[in-house]
Every structure is written in structure tokens, then in C-alpha cells.
Amino acid sequence: MWNAVDRLLEKAIGENAFPGCAIAAGQRGKVLYTNVSGYLVRDGERLVKHSTRYDVGALTQVLVTMPLCMIAVERGLLGPEDTVDRFLPEVPADKKTITVAQLLTQTSGLSPHFLLQEEARSDKDALGALLRHPLASPVGGKVSDSGMGFLLLGFLLEKVFDMPLDEAAKRFVTAPLHMNHTGYLPSGSDVAPTSIRDDNGVLQPGCPLDGNARFLHGVAGHSGLFTNLEDATRFASMLSLNGRTEDGVFLSQRAVHLVSTERTRGMNAARGYGFHITKRQNPFLGMLWPSDGYGLRDPASGSAIAVSPLDGFFTVVLMNGAYTPANRAEGERFLRQCLNAAYAAFQHENGAEDCEA
């Protein structure tokens, strides 16, 4: 059944949906399937490899920012209920009641997106510009996916840990998980370029696609991270084991429960801390995935991570697409097809005794 996933990837690459892709699937720490297909760039000659590092955009939010928040909670450095002005005293009155939990669940009321370069006097004024920008909706009123909330969390975490965000990410997340090929601003021949080019039209591998991440010199809480299949699979495997790794406990089981279960009941969308929660009325992971599976997709590149707590199944998809609002729905459809095929293959191979009715 895994060949159905293979065929989907081959078809999408053949139709020029994206140049290259890497996918892994497994259960409770055991990898069951991997596939690497395509090229580093469109119409290119260099094949992607298992070691290829991809710009994962919004997945930065769950690979770096969310775990740093939960590590800070476990160490007593902050609480989800803490308001942002506890750590950032310059927060204006209209944003003083925003909590860490609301930033994590996308219910802060911050604007979904705006370009810092248009409102900040310089990169040093980025936080000020973010705080000056008017709210888009009342604080805590509704779910509205906003990279700006995780961008703000990045600034907040630098205060909490008293170090730059990329240093905190390495010290507390990527190094303990042995994610040795994950980080900001990578270099080398194994980096899949985004569509960003220099003034001479030359592609710039390691330069993130997100404009606000670039304005912040590649390091931000909402975007900018690069990773490869092995490292992203390590992270997904840890989640599927409720925070455990071969070295011991990375996150407590309760912390994983907090991030992976719905925290927005009664609102317009189901969100955990950083993750979207799939529901029967909104099966964003695909109809075959059990309700309460969780994950996140980067809308620009198409990369995604998904975990089913029911049976410990997980899937990681990394790709170097360049989706725009005009074709984003096609990217979402492809991901659902891919995740459905992967989950079906898992069920056929392992039986369906864990599957809900």
C-alpha cells in the first residue's frame, strides 16, 4: 500500500507542483516508510537526498517556539496564563491582556500578517512595530492564524531565556534531540533553495522565503527554520511517544497533552498549542485520520507534520514548493491525499484494531 504514496509524489513532481519532496511515516518511534523524490530546483539536475534541508516556514512554530515555551513552563520560567507584559513591559494597553496561551492558540487578536519592513524603522524596531500595529480582533475572541503571534513569542522567549532565539533553539531543542541538521541560516550543497534570489538573479540557498524572517536576518519565532527528513522525523517520533526519546524524557507527557489537544473549545477552529486539531467537521489531515489527530502545514512550502495520538502514527512531509494564495488549495488537497494514503498503508500493514468507529 505504500506504493500509493510513491505514486502520489511522482505524479505531483511530474506535474511540477513542487521540485522535490521527502516523506517519512512511522508509529511510536519506529519508522515504517520513507521516500525521497525530485530535485533541488525546478528543471534542475541535482536530486534531493535524505540529507536535503528544507525551509519549513511555519513549522518553525512547533519545532522551535512551542517546545521552548513548554520547556520554560516545565522550568517555572513562565506560565501559559502569564500576560506578555510580564516579560515585555513596553507592551501597549490594547495588548496587555494577551496571554502566552493565546499566542500559542492563535487567539491573541494580532493581525494575521503584515510586513515589518513597511512599518519598522529598522530591524531593531521590529518588536516596536509589532506592538504598535493595531489588533485585528478582540483579544481571546476567535482563532485567526497569525504568524505575528509566534513572532512575538520569539521575542518573549529571548527575554525568558536571556539569549538569542537561535541559541536557545540549539541549546534546549535541537541538541538534546540530536537534530544536528536543523537550524537557521544553513549553508552547504544540501540546502534546497527557496525562490529567493540576489540582485543578480542567483538563488540564495539558506535564505528563508518568509519576508519577516528575512527582515530579522533569518531568525524568528514564526518562520525561518531549515531541517531535513531525519531530524523532523526525530521530532515527530518524540511526539508520538508522548515526549520520550531513546535518551529519556524530552517533554513531560502532560506538556505534550497540552500542546496536542484542543484549547479553543467553543471557538471557530480547534487549536492546541501551535498545532491544528483535526475534527470530523474539519478533517484537515484527511478523512482517514482519526479525530483529534494533530499537525501543522506550512502554507508556503507545503511541508507538514502530523501525529495521531490514538495509535501513535506520525507522518512528516518536507517539500520545496512555492505555494501562493492562488494555488494554496491545491497544496492542501495534495497533503490530505498524501496523509490519507499514508494512514491507509499503515492500517493495511498493521491492522485496524486501534481505529475508532
Predicted regions and their residues:
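Active-site SXXK
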Residues: D6-E10, I23, G29, T52-E81, ...
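Short, gly/Ser/Thr-rich active-site loops of penicillin-recognizing serine hydrolases
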Residues: L241, T245, A255, S260-R263, ...
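Short, glycine/proline-biased beta-turn/loop segments that scaffold the active-site neighborhood
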Residues: G79-D94
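Short, surface-exposed beta-strand/loop micro-motifs that present aromatic residues
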Residues: S301-L310, F314
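Hydrophobic (often cysteine-bearing) scaffold residues that line and stabilize catalytic clefts
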Residues: M1, V5, V56, T60, ...
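Short beta->alpha transition motifs characteristic of CBS
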Residues: Y33-V41, R297, L318-A322
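Short, surface-exposed loop or secondary-structure junction motifs
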Residues: V41, D94-D292
